[in-house]
């Protein structure tokens, strides 16, 4: 099993002082910064463009940036985020006319590529593109807004995705996003996830280190 990665979502950060807040959460022990990109077309919200990603790099953030594209179409914006400093770029299969091509484009731009599955979306989109996938991201809420509750059916889906990944033999991360918090992260990890997006569960607390330490303790109980 890969080392667990904690990826706070800046959707829940203090946007008025984003650089400071991101640095603080990294200092507290986060591994990756998760970047929710919404276009008010594919999902009913509008968030961040490549300029914000570039601004974090210019500020001095060196941690991996995990860009989750909730936009349609996707191909136009992929090179812009790669140039702005993204390390991972993931998208929803139904938002691309040519999934294989979009995955290859991400890799051609020097980033790790991934597919994102909404709660009711089947995993069958993976069948013919596993060789081009570095990350499988399962949404455990319906995308668009932070602060929602974890959808329990995601646990079974995580188990299915873990089986697919393990049997493929490829080096693929299994990420989960939505409603992840201290009191459910252990069962989420036990179902097979190794990368965890948490927004309000971390940024909504006054002491980031305390909550990340609590998360690490829960994760250690799974791998023990």
Swiss-Prot record:
GO molecular function list: D-ribulose-phosphate 3-epimerase activity; metal ion binding
Entry GO CC: cytosol
Gene Ontology biological-process annotations: carbohydrate metabolic process; pentose catabolic process; pentose-phosphate shunt, non-oxidative branch
CC cofactor: a divalent metal cation
SUPFAM superfamilies, A to Z: Ribulose-phoshate binding barrel
Keyword Metal-binding: yes
Residues engaged in binding a divalent metal cation: 34, 36, 68, 177
Cleaved signal peptide residues: none
Comment on bound cofactor: Binds 1 divalent metal cation per subunit.
UniProt pathway: Carbohydrate degradation
Record-linked InterPro entries: Aldolase_TIM, Ribul_P_3_epim, Ribul_P_3_epim-like, RibuloseP-bd_barrel
A Pfam family: Ribul_P_3_epim
Enzyme category, top tier: isomerase
Keywords (A to Z) from UniProt: Carbohydrate metabolism, Isomerase, Metal-binding
Residues reported in the UniProt entry to bind substrate: 9, 68, 144-147, 177-179, 199-200
CDD domains: RPE
Family in the record: Belongs to the ribulose-phosphate 3-epimerase family.
Name the record gives this protein: Ribulose-phosphate 3-epimerase
């Amino acid at each position: 099993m890969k080392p667990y990665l904690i990826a706070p979502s800046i959707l829940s950060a203090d946007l008025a002082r984003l650089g400071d807040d991101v640095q603080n959460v990294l200092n507290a022990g986060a591994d990756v910064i998760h970047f929710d990109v919404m276009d008010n077309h594919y999902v009913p919200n509008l968030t961040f463009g490549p300029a914000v990603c570039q601004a974090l790099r210019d500020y001095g953030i060196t941690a991996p940036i995990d860009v989750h594209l909730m936009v349609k179409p996707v191909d136009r914006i992929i090179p812009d985020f790669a140039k702005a400093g993204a390390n991972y770029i993931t998208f929803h299969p139904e938002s691309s006319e040519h999934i294989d091509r979009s995955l290859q484009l991400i890799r051609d731009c020097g980033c790790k590529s991934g597919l994102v599955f909404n709660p009711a979306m089947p995993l069958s989109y993976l069948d013919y593109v596993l060789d081009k996938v570095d990350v499988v991201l399962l949404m455990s809420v319906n995308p668009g807004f932070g602060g929602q509750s974890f959808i329990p059916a995601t646990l079974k889906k995580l188990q299915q995705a873990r089986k697919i990944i393990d049997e493929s033999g490829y080096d693929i991360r299994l990420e989960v996003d939505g409603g992840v918090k201290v009191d459910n992260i252990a069962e989420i990890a036990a179902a097979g996830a190794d990368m965890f997006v948490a927004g309000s569960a971390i940024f909504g607390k006054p002491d980031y280190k305390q909550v990340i330490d609590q998360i690490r303790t829960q994760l250690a109980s799974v791998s023990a």
